[in-house]
């Protein structure tokens, strides 16, 4: 059997890359979801297979600190042993060549489900013997972030924090990169909400000009992940 994404010399074939797409936002059809869909289209265009999972539809918790993943009697030290609604998705993570996870920014942070997923998928691979990874494979990770903040605010207040925030994905032994979408359109009609601080006309004009560019950037991200050796 060939390894993921590598040539099967016995058959002379190349196995199809698997890319798992995870929506960490509560809306299934808004900015984050649209960018993830574009990334998936880019991956498929490069010959990869994709699957999309909405994390908000799963019933799971953050790490329970059971430390089963650190127990020497356990056969697979890099797997989370706590079984709940995330278990099946984690198995798909372990089998993927890359994952693309998207999240809006709430109060300067990704959503709670994204944080919980990140810990559950990476903490088991962290060895407390030498602080190296016990995971035997390599999974590249792309993070797509959407936010009301503009790029200047992000660069000043969020950028370095987000780069540090997603460091745990390095325990999956692949590359981690972040794609950002700024000043997003929250709702189609701002007059229905207590959002007077936002200029609806300005928001819509920015969205009409910028969001197609963001979708293209997401498409190229997916294509690049699927093409990476």
Language-model features and meaning:
Residues 3-130, 195-229:
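N-terminal beta1-alpha1-beta2 submodule of the flavodoxin-like/Rossmannoid cofactor-binding fold
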Residues 63-66, 155-156, 188-193:
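Short aromatic-enriched loop/helix-cap "lid" or pocket-rim segments at secondary-structure transitions
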Residues 106-108, 149-150, 185:
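Short, catalytically relevant binding-site loops at active-site mouths
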Residues 112-113, 126-179:
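Short, glycine-/small-residue-rich phosphate/pyrophosphate-handling segment
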Residues 177-188:
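Beta-strand-loop-alpha "switch" segments that mediate conformational coupling across diverse proteins
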């Amino acid at each position: 059997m060939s390894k993921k994404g590598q040539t099967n010399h016995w058959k002379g074939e190349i196995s199809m890359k698997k890319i798992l797409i995870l929506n960490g936002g509560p809306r299934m059809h808004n900015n984050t979801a649209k960018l993830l869909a574009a990334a998936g289209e880019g991956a498929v265009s490069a010959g990869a297979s994709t699957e999309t999972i909405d994390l908000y539809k799963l019933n799971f918790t953050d790490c329970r600190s059971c430390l089963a993943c650190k127990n020497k009697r356990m056969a697979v030290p890099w797997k989370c042993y706590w079984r709940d609604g995330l278990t099946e998705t984690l198995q798909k993570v372990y089998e993927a060549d890359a994952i693309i996870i998207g999240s809006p920014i709430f109060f300067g942070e990704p959503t709670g489900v994204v944080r919980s997923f990140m810990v559950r998928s990476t903490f088991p691979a962290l060895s407390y013997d030498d602080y190296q990874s016990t995971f035997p494979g390599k999974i590249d990770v792309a993070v797509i972030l959407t936010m009301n903040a503009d790029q200047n605010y992000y660069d000043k207040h969020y950028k370095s924090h987000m780069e540090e925030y997603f460091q745990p994905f390095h325990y999956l032994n692949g590359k981690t990169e972040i794609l950002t979408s700024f000043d997003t359109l929250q709702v189609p009609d701002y007059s229905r909400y207590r959002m007077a601080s936002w200029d609806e006309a300005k928001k819509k004009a920015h969205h009409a000009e910028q969001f197609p560019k963001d979708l293209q950037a997401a498409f190229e991200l997916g294509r690049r992940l699927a093409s990476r050796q």
